[in-house]
């Protein structure tokens, strides 16, 4: 057994939109089931929630730069449905779509692969 990763191994990271994005009530984002659950008193330790989280929504450029600094080559992220469709269906939220478009542009600039 080798203790070394193969040369063609792709180092990457993964995130969940609820856990990192924050910006829970700006730019037209609707409420998710997790927003509702985490704001129900007694459901979450110390009544914590992800209203701000790591503020990836506002700091995505810094976050992508950090990924580049540690030489990641792949990034898997989830898309917040309530950010795209605030009412769950019907009309989409342009600001939500724009956020993910800008995030993808930033990832592509640094040749990070979205998985």
Language-model segments: residues:
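N-terminal structural segment of carbohydrate-active enzymes
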Residues: 2-93, 97, 101-108
């Amino acid at each position: 057994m080798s203790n070394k990763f193969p040369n063609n191994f792709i180092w990457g990271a993964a995130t969940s939109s609820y856990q990192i994005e924050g910006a829970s009530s700006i730019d037209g984002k609707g409420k998710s089931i997790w927003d509702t659950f985490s704001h129900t008193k007694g459901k979450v330790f110390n009544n914590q929630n992800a209203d701000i989280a790591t503020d990836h929504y506002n700091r995505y450029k810094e976050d992508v730069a950090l990924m580049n600094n540690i030489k990641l080559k792949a990034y898997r992220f989830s898309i917040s449905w309530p950010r795209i469709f605030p009412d769950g269906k019907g009309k989409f939220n342009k600001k939500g779509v724009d956020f993910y478009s800008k995030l993808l542009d930033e990832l592509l600039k640094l040749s990070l692969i979205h998985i």
